[in-house]
């Protein structure tokens, strides 16, 4: 962090294995059959994955870049896309799960100081900007930070025989449902200010 904003603008971090453990058994089973498709790259990630080093199941969904969610239909060799209402509900449930972690002990809001340097494991820790981080510099103050991402050595296979990516800019291979390409993906909450 070169310069933190004068009026907040921290980052919320959540331990994704602990978040998965907080889910009920029916939701764990359902979410384990879901895979998200990145709105810009078409990369497919399982909503629930096993951490390659820790061996714990963790939940993962990018609220700002998801273009589609594919469901493996239980007991069948078939897939379908979530429709708009289902994807909105899923995103709200995931967002609520992250927020619940603030009181349940698996999420934290970190406010930056100058010269802070943080490292996180993206396979086990979710992060998102606090709402005030999207305020204008006139309201929040100017924040200057550098971010770097290290390419991982473990790929998250989507499972169920799905390919590692789809051409998100072509028509959906799954028929009806949300299939949104580009920008910040599917807008699940019109009130949520998003910037990527």
Feature-to-residue mapping (PLM):
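Non-heme Fe(II) oxygenase catalytic core, chiefly the N-lobe of the double-stranded beta-helix
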Residues: 1-116, 123-196
